[in-house]
Amino acid sequence: MAQQQQQQHNHQTSNNNNNNSSILLLQQQQLHQEQLQQYNNNLYSQNYNMEEYERRKRREREKIERQQGIQIDDRETSLFGEPRRLTEADADITAALGEFGDARVYINQSTVGISRHTPGAGNPRLQAPLQPPPKSLGHSPSYTGSTGSASASANSAVPSQQQQQQHYNGTGGRFLPPAASKRSSSGAGQQPLPQEKDISKMISEMADNFRVTPLTSIAATPHAPVRENYNLNGPNKNKYMDDIISSPLSQPSSLMTPLFAPIAPIASPPQTSQLPLGGATSLTGSSEAVLGLAPLQQLPPTPPKAASAITSPAAAKPLKTEKNHTLEKQDSCLENDLELSESEDEQPKKEGRSAGNSSNSSESDSSESGSESSSKNDAQPLPNHKLHHQQQQQLQQQPLQQQQHQQQQQQQILLQQQQQQRPQQLTANGKSEKKKYKHAIIAGGSNTITGLLTSSGFGSGGNGGPGGNSCGPGSGASASAGTMSSGGSSSNKTPSPTESNKWTLSRFFPKPANQTNTESATPGNVSMKVPGILPGGAQIIPEPIEVSTAIVKNEKIHDDPMDMDDGEEDDDDEDQQQQQQQQLHYRADLSVTPVSVKKEAIDGVSELGLAAIPKNQIKRESSEALHASRLSDSGTSGSSSSSSSSSESAPGGEVVPMPGPGETLQIPGGAAITSVMRVPPTLTQKAPSSTSVTLMPILPLPMSPKQRQKKQRKKKTSTPIVNSSDEDEPAPKHPGLDYTAVSAHSQSTATAPAKKRGRPRKQQQQSGGSGNLSSASAGSSSQTKGPTLTAAKKPLCKALPAMGGARKRDHSSQSSSNGNTPTKKMATPMSVSAPPKTASVHRDSSSSDDDSSSSGGSSSKSSSSSSSSDDTEEAQNTNCRIVKLNKTGAGAVAAKVLLGSGSSSALSSGSEAEDQARSQAGSGKALAQQMPPYKPQVMSQHSQQLSSSECSSSSGDRGGTGAGSSSSGEEDEARHEKERERKPKSDKNKISTLTRIFNPKEGGAKKQGQVVIMDLQEEQQQGKLDAATQSSQIPATAPAVKPRMTPTQQLQQQHAQSQQMLGTSLASPARTTTPHLTSLICKIDLSKLSRERIMRLKKLTPAQQNGHLTPKGQAASAVQMPNGYANDAVPAAKVKPEHPVKPEPDADYEAKFKPGSVKQEFQLKQERDRDRERERERDREQPPGRRRKRSSSSSSSPYKEKKRKKEKTDQLQICKELLPSNNHERIPNHDRLSYDKLQLLHEDAAAAAAASGVGAAPNGSPRKNLLAMSPLPPPPISTAIAIVPPITCNEAVQTTPPLTTSTSPQAASAVTEPAPPAVAVPPAPVTRLIYRSYFDREEAHPSADLRRNNQFLQEAVNRKHAADAEPDSFNQVTLYLEAVVYFLLTADAMERCSSEATYTMYKDTLSLIKFISFKFRPQHSANGQTKTHMAKVAILSLRCQSLISLKLYNLRRANCRDIIASLTDFFRTGRGDIVNGNTPSSISPSNSVGSQGSGSNTPPGRIVPRDIHNQLSKQNEYLSYVHSAHELWDQADHSVRKGNHTDFFRELDHENGPLTLHSTMHEVFRYVQAGLKTLRDAVSHTAHPTQ
């Protein structure tokens, strides 16, 4: 029965194959001409790809390694290991490689379905003509299908084989059956292409010849970049399968179905390039795979031109889409840089990307979150494909008849669908075309990448894949989008042709209809400055360099929001997924990233076209409907693609369907780091005034795509810079943009990431999965200070249309550091509890993003996740005001607004969802209370939005956060605490990611700005320690203090905000005369990570502020002052100017002018480190209770500060009165100290006094010791002063507590309160190290008593003889050295009697010590301890030799002086005969050969008189002593350091005085004797224990 069934099944399969073949042949014949034309147009692409293979392969490999941080393990080996196993088909493969024509002929004639994978498939052009008969695309599909349906065995193996194909592992007959099964799953009938050969024969032929070989061969061929780039055998094989539509890798991996792989490649190219072939791409079932293959084989993928011809409307879109991709290519470097951060995220992405194209990695890089979603999408299609495969397998498992029947039905249905789709595409008009095109692109992307891969790569996936993936939209759309999808998916890099595709690379690069072949440029050759079309059909649109300044993760391109609104929501899901995949592929394949598309893509793009910008990029849709549609689209798209993207806030996270031909897909210049969320970002420019809160309605962004593209992406990138400052403040706060609502939408997706925000790139938005550096560091917003590389580019946001306008909110402000006042989009009402968590996730990224892109991103996310929220947000969005809180002056208003934002701030602050929820609850209320004035527009529901503005205003970063925290006080504090607790986890990952991203070597800086990576985590960690104190203080002080005075903020802002202010001033063109860098300077302080705790532990270290060594705890302890400083309490007037008491300078002043903050990026690394160290010391020494986060000045611009200064003139006067006049002179910045700050300072000091009174003494003691040791005397400090803890001013400036002498009652009270404890603890006496003066040397010489001198000599002689007889080496050398020093004493005594005898004694002693020096070398048998002691003795010997040599010179110095004078005269006058010169000589002047040969002649020279010669000899001797003295001394020093004997000699120096070249012989004697005694004691001590 089984055999009969099998035979019947085979028969049915053959019939089905025949039917399918006839159908397919008709379709193929119809499409053949089109494809052939396309092929002709794209053939150049193939050649180009082949030529560029090595270079592209190398580049892709490097990129992947760099991006993933993963070293590709023997990818080539893995790739070629399996592929290299060539069967007898080697000759054929070789022919294919060498001669495509021959290979093609062979395949066409002898095989049914391998045209692509078989060597013959190599030449698409050759194949194209032959395709009709073998069009066996059929080869792959028909072969596979035939095989699968033709042979029962194939069918039996089909299910497993299909899976095996996916696994890529599988060779031999098993793959063959899978091929068949794949085919069958595709649909047996799809095989019309095969030339009705006996299917069994064809299958056997393929199995025998091509089973392993075709795929393997292709994979092995150097021309298979994809293969080479990816390890097919490795764990990533699935990745390749998913991503590669042709998925030669996955299919090759399933060598069993070389046909499949070819089919898949063919299918994918046809879908991409052949989308025009509605039927071909539409062959969802096996027919699709077959047609896909057939079109691919028959028609090289139609160049974009051909594709456009087939589907003119769609084609136009693909062109633009490709154009975007081409632009993406431009940003590949950025992508690469960004890719570094996605190391963890990449794998999933890679799996999705790498299979299809190396471009996948590029795309994932361009938009991590986008790539994640795309990978998710790929994964989803893959599951679909898998489902199809499984279903098909099941069908195959079912009675063969039923299976065949079903397959036939499926094929017919697929054909019908394809035909319908094709007409639809052709007939599609306007929006429908756009939609379909979008779908085509998306479907093409999914189909091409996932769909194709699914369909052709997975067999049944072929049927279901195209149908399922592109399903209604689009097989046909896929064809029209084919240009784009082929360019995007398979030609992302151009490149990596699938194995089947390998030789028909042009398929992957369909050219736009209007494009000529010459227009395509190789990635290497592509000049982004010159307009052109890449092989993939991507158009290169030259953009200003500034556009690329942002590190941009390529964002997914969305179709017009309108189209989406029109009902493309469903399509959008698929489209977005597909597009994301495509874009990922494009980005990977095309060196240009979509960012490049910014300008040109926008041409002809309507506002909707702009709306097509990825949702993440679009800050806000101007219309709710559009927004809602997007939300639904992204949500439908399986919120996995758009939701996850939005939640990830990856630029490409949400992919709006590619704009239709009319809708130029605009990729905003948004940084890959920060994708602008659709939530309308407030485009608030700079906060108008530091003291005022400016609410500005967000206008729709200008449609000009260029601006928007530039600004959004770049801004996103630059936004991180603002974030860097913002991040300094509990970064999460402002990130708490009203992302709550936004978060709410994307919450499902984002919520999970929220926890993972620690992982910068991987996590969706927060992690930086959004591709935002800021997102990555958003979790540790303080860490990700500097993602705002491109923040300066405000114009981008302007370019955005209304929806862009929503985004606009942050971008312009973000672009300038200060400008980051993106109004929190009116997020969906705080009511959403889950959103808060998401918001926190968003917040993480947004805090990185500086709220602008981040808030925008989260808004977009939320909109995508929940259309309702999005709609609300959108409506609000329109109403959204950009609230810029000038944190400084905003005081009450800021507090109110920030309060509302405080909740979002809590979210943004990096608090977990719980914090966010709590914040939302509290801040929602506070918002209702505080926000009412602003509420009318949108704020009612979006308390977070205000918070967003709070966070967004970079100048207000800390101030805003401060306001929010003061208003929400306890909540903020709690959030900060939690934030600090959590940040250490996420911050580390984010920091590493940011570091890599911004590493100039990685191209992160991109000459777009300087990225200073600084870690504020230290402050946050300290905040944890101080949390309890702060929690108590903050509620009390917050109301009294301006929002920017929030203690936590004050601390973080002190460091980060001043940096931010710096960056902002540079970044904000409006505010600053300084030309803004292309991107803001990102300041990410990583240094504080590890040091904080260490520094905290080391409170002993004197705090160095402004270069002063004033210990922070110094106030607590009165230190004994060396050098005549008064130890007792000293009036303030007596304070040394070098250690003035410094009031806390104005926050703005510090931010602007503080040395540490001003242009830190330009400071030397050492200087920055020193400043940071000082700041950390101040922070650690500051009691936690006193730790106040200095609120950053609301405005970063200098003139705002000036204005503030004027306003504070009265306060300054008061401060001056409070401070000593000398201090004023010393500290100009104290003038900027605000009275309220001073008051707070006093209060803090008083509060700290109680706590510090007890600890003052302990801290003082260590400090005292350090001071005593320090070369600089500590400044005199009164006891009262000591009690008052010094207050840390903003970053660089530390204010010492006001002296007790200060007249101010407040100061007096502050001092007096702590005074009693200070008095109670008298300063402990400080041990003074006494160093001898050179002139204090002992002048007393031993008596000239001859008996004493003789005694020294006798001692020396005795020791010398004892040493000669000593058997022990150590004792011998010590005795010799003792004899030497006694000889030195004798010589020194003799010096008074006879200098000549003394000289002789020293000289003999030197000879003796040199003679015995060899004994200092330890014997090999000596133990380690003995060797060490011997080495020390040798060092002492070297010292003695050096001093003896110098002594010998000194004894002859007078003679040497005379000799030098005589010789100088001789050489000056030139007296002396010149040999062979002017004077006659006995030597013949001739230089004849004869005379020279005789040897009687000497070379020309001067005759030196004998006396001069003798003098020269003496001089040489004397000067050699000087030389030897210094050489021997240096040798001794080197030995000390080399042997780690510094401690030993340091101790000797302390006990006996340092030994120098000026030491007397008595000092030498004492020093050496002490050293020898110590060594003997050590030896005897070690010897006794052993005994």
UniProtKB/Swiss-Prot annotation:
Compositional bias segments (type: Gly residues): 458-475
Modified residues (Phosphoserine): S341, S343, S724, S725, S775, S777, S1261
Entry keyword annotation includes S-adenosyl-L-methionine: no
Highest taxon, organism lineage: Eukaryota
DNA-binding region residue numbers: 754-766
Keywords in alphabetical order: Developmental protein, DNA-binding, Nucleus, Pair-rule protein, Phosphoprotein, Transcription, Transcription regulation
Protein's cellular compartments: Nucleus
Biased composition, class Basic residues, residue ranges: 707-717
Main subcellular localisation: nucleus
Acidic residues: compositionally biased ranges: 334-345, 562-576
Biased segments, Basic and acidic residues type: 319-332, 973-990, 1135-1153, 1162-1184
Comp. bias regions, Low complexity: 140-169, 305-318, 354-426, 476-496, 629-663, 763-802, 853-869, 902-911, 940-956, 1049-1060, 1297-1313, 1477-1497
Biological process per Gene Ontology, one example term: regulation of DNA-templated transcription
The keyword Phosphoprotein belongs to this UniProt entry's keyword annotation: yes
Polar residues bias spans: 182-193, 513-525, 682-694, 813-823, 1061-1073
Modified residues (Phosphothreonine): T311
InterPro entries: AF4/FMR2, AF4/FMR2_CHD
GO molecular function: DNA binding; transcription coregulator activity
Region described as Disordered: spans on this chain: 1-20, 115-194, 296-539, 551-593, 606-880, 902-996, 1049-1073, 1130-1213, 1297-1317, 1477-1506
Family under the similarity heading: Belongs to the AF4 family.
Function: Has a role in transcriptional regulation. Acts in parallel with the Ras/MAPK and the PI3K/PKB pathways in the control of cell identity and cellular growth. Essential for regulation of the cytoskeleton and cell growth but not for cell proliferation or growth rate. Required specifically for the microtubule-based basal transport of lipid droplets. Plays a partially redundant function downstream of Raf in cell fate specification in the developing eye. Pair-rule protein that regulates embryonic cellularization, gastrulation and segmentation.
Protein's UniProt name: AF4/FMR2 family member lilli
Protein's organism: Drosophila ananassae (Fruit fly)
Species classification: Eukaryota, Metazoa, Ecdysozoa, Arthropoda, Hexapoda
